[in-house]
Amino acid sequence: MIRYLMCILLLLSVVISGCGKTDKITETAAETQNYTVHDIRGKKITFAKKPERIASSFVYADEILLDLVDHQKIVGLSKWVHDPGLSMGHKQAEDVPGIVENNLESVIALKPDLFFIADTAKKEYIDSLEDAGIKVYVFKYISRLDEIPDLVKGIGEAVGEKEKAETLIKTMNIKINAVKTKVAAIPQKQRKTGMLFLRFGAIGGAGCIYNDILSTAGIEDCYQQARPA
């Protein structure tokens, strides 16, 4: 979904160069050992080595993991990452057959040594996963464009791939800055008004990541004006 949103942004601004697959990042030889991270809850999670059975229940995290870790280390992703209408990572995910369903049994069956889940999940569900001995990294559900780098950074630190995460963030910022430069050259009178449609309908409005995308691309979001009174 993140790359899908970035692709929308680049297309809207008529940036021709790449929004497809992120260039493969070279594997580092050294394995990070004995490291500790904190998730959005402030919970401390300690690793003796990089996790080798990683699972995720949310498409944002799915796509980031596909770019950060060897796919053989991913035992399960959400079903949404396999949907070409929602995820630019669906082809990358073809070699990850495991599907994380929205139930405790599905996750436990995958035997992950690290599980990513958004903070929109019920506390009782997260507690049950941890009671089953699973390390759970809870991340903030992102709703704004400028929240993406923190998500990438946090996931990168959790899987022991901090440098790769920094490279992804740098690549994203380069693309966004290229969009802003292009938009800055467009006279105000030539700016467009528009609205984003996904297959389930129109989406947008102030405080929404889709509104951020349109604004960054120099397009006025008319979602609020178009909504029925």
Outline where the language-model segments fall.
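A short, structured surface patch at a secondary-structure boundary
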Residues: 53-119, 219-222
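Bacterial N-terminal signal peptides
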Residues: 7-15
